[in-house]
Regions:
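Conserved micro-motifs of the catalytic ATP-binding
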Residues: 25, 29-33
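Short helix-loop "hinge" at the ATP-lid/N-box region of the Bergerat-fold HATPase_c
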Residues: 48-49
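Short beta-strand/loop element within the Bergerat-fold HATPase_c
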Residues: 54-65
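Acidic ATP/Mg2+-coordinating residue in the GHKL
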Residues: 70
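Short conserved segment of the HATPase_c
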Residues: 75-88
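Short alpha-helical Gxxx[C/S/T] motif in the catalytic ATP-binding
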Residues: 103, 107
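Conserved glycine-rich
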Residues: 115-116
Length: 142
């Protein structure tokens, strides 16, 4: 429901850019702070929309993680290691002057505080996948 809520919020951007959205395997429940998780997902989706000119975005849950995969311009390998640094704008962000270098930095900080892990894989010209992995909750019953 949280992902669908965010998609509704950004629906006009998908329509204006002619991008597709593919949601699947999202019928899961995770233990997290909804407000802060929303901030992370919105930031990642906003980046995907900003750097995807054609094709679309796929959002799915697999291996205890939420994955946002786009068909955008991708991130250079030399930039991948630094995307979570405060104030860092990769080559594409500097080229288009659309990046403050704070969004992914803040997303990483929030994810860390929530006990989640956020990672990025990307290929220039192929797109980017951002993954938010959730800690498996262990419940003890006395």
């Amino acid at each position: 429901d949280l992902v669908k809520e965010i998609i509704r919020k950004y629906a006009l951007f998908f329509i204006q850019k002619g991008l597709t959205i593919n949601l699947h395997d999202l019928d899961v429940k995770v233990v997290s702070d909804e407000k802060w998780l929303l901030v992370i997902i919105e930031q990642v989706l906003s980046n995907s929309l900003k750097y995807t000119k054609s094709g679309g975005i796929e959002i799915y849950f697999k291996d205890n993680g939420l994955h946002l995969k786009d068909s955008g311009i991708g991130i250079k390998n030399s930039d991948i290691l630094r995307v979570f640094e405060r104030g860092f704008s990769g080559y594409n962000g500097r080229l288009t002057q659309q990046s403050s270098g704070l969004g992914l930095y803040l997303s990483k900080k929030i994810a860390d505080q929530l006990g989640h892990d956020i990672s990025i894989s990307s290929q220039v010209g192929q797109g980017t996948t951002v993954s938010i992995h959730f800690q498996k909750q262990k419940l003890a019953i006395d």
